[in-house]
Structure formats: C-alpha cells, structure tokens
A protein has these predicted regions:
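A short helix->loop->beta-strand "cap" motif at the edges of active sites that frequently abuts
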Residues: 13-14, 137
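Short, conserved active-site loop motifs that form the nucleotide-linked donor/cofactor pocket
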Residues: 16, 81-83, 157
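Hydrophobic/aromatic beta-strand patches that form the interior of the parallel beta-sheet core
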Residues: 17-19, 67, 103, 140, ...
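A charged, aromatic-enriched C-terminal amphipathic alpha-helix characteristic of glycosyltransferases
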Residues: 161-164, 168, 175-210
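A short acidic/histidine/glycine-rich donor-binding loop in glycosyltransferase catalytic cores
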Residues: 154-160
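Conserved catalytic-core segment of nucleotide-activated headgroup transferases in glycan assembly
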Residues: 21-98
Length: 210
C-alpha cells in the first residue's frame, strides 16, 4: 500500500468529494406540465454498438411508444412503436422531449445491459440520467446500474432487470403514484438545472479549507 506506507492515504481521502449526479444547467427552463407515461424517450448516441437493443424493442409487449433522439440511428426493421425524432443540441433537447420516461439502457439486448457499454453502467454516472431528470422526466434504469439504488430511494423512476418488465410496471402504477414521482423529479430537476451538485462540492471544499 504505497499511499498508506507514505502517510498519504488520509490526505487523498480528505481531497475526494462525491459529486453525485452531473448538473444539467438550463437557465429559465420550465418542464412540460403534462406527460404521457406510455411514451419513453431514448436520447444519446444511437449507434448499433451502443444501442443494439433498439432493433429488438418489438419483443417488449405492450402499448408503449419509443421516441429516439440522437445521431447514428440506423433503422433495420420498421417498428411503428419506434419513432425517430432527429438530432438536437443538449440545450434544445429538454424543450423537445415531452415523453413520460427517459430510458438509461445500453448494449445489444432488451433482456439486460450487455457488452462494454452495458457493463459500464454498473460503475458510471450516466449524463443522460441528468438530462432526463433536468427535463422533468422520471427515468427507467437497469437494476444493476450504479445509480439504480439512488433512483429507487428517491422515487425518481423505475429499475428493471429487463425492458420486458416495463409495460406491466407502468400499467400497475396509479395516476397518483406517477404524479408523486413527477413531483420528486421536479425537485431534483430544479437542483440539477441550478447547478446545485457542483455548488455543494465547492461549499464542502471551502468549508474544509477554513
């Protein structure tokens, strides 16, 4: 243990601060007041290596619509439930997306997040989660994702083992439960849009230096 043997371990520990979710600054933005909980937004780089699961969304039974936002989308088979909305800048996206959920899912399967991109969700803090929440949308995330426990605790969305679970979970949810989730998202979204995550860290650093 090099750090420990040289007495540097505690120094490094004191200098580490946990950011949590990334901020998503959108000054003056007001989220949509009405959302359709049977519509799901999928935003980001839609290349096949990262979002290969898109071709198999037809395996997910139910009356859901998937709205895609981002570059590199290649439609392999027509699916009336999948709608490509085009490519927008990060600043434009929150005003464009009106769906009821934002999906955080990577890999080539609807059954689990697979491959390098899917496995990375076990460790990283996906920026698209901040995008969705700042836009006013609850999120749907893989149950093994690093952010899944926090999403459950804060009641900011759904965590699933497989995308095939989504229709039943949404159908079981009452309108009151969904509205409560939207209220939770509203509060978190305000913090992300105002840059509260970074401000919290800078306040901690300043406090430690005093």
């Amino acid at each position: 243990d090099v750090l420990g043997s040289r007495g540097l371990g505690d120094v490094y520990k004191r200098q580490i601060h946990i950011l949590g979710l990334f901020d998503y600054r959108i000054p003056g933005f007001q989220p949509a007041s009405e959302r359709n909980r049977y519509e799901i937004a999928i935003a980001g780089n839609l290349k096949a290596e990262k979002c290969g699961f898109l071709k198999d969304l037809k395996q997910v039974q139910g009356n859901l619509e998937y709205h895609l936002y981002g570059p590199n989308y290649q439609e392999t088979e027509k699916n009336p439930q999948v709608i490509y909305e085009g490519q927008y800048t990060p600043e434009q996206l929150p005003s464009v997306m009106k769906e009821g959920w934002g999906l955080v899912w990577d890999g080539g399967s609807v059954h689990e997040c697979q491959g390098a991109f899917g496995g990375y969700l076990k460790f990283n803090n996906p920026h698209k989660a901040s995008l969705y929440l700042a836009s006013g949308m609850p999120v749907i995330v893989w149950e093994q994702a690093a952010i899944a426990p926090w999403i459950r605790e804060q009641k900011l969305g759904l965590t699933v083992k497989s995308l095939e679970e989504i229709p039943e979970l949404i159908n079981r949810m009452t309108e009151e439960e969904y509205k409560e989730m939207l209220q939770n998202v509203k509060k978190t979204g305000e913090h992300l849009r105002e840059g509260s995550s970074l401000k919290k860290i800078t306040d901690e650093i300043e406090s430690n230096e005093q």
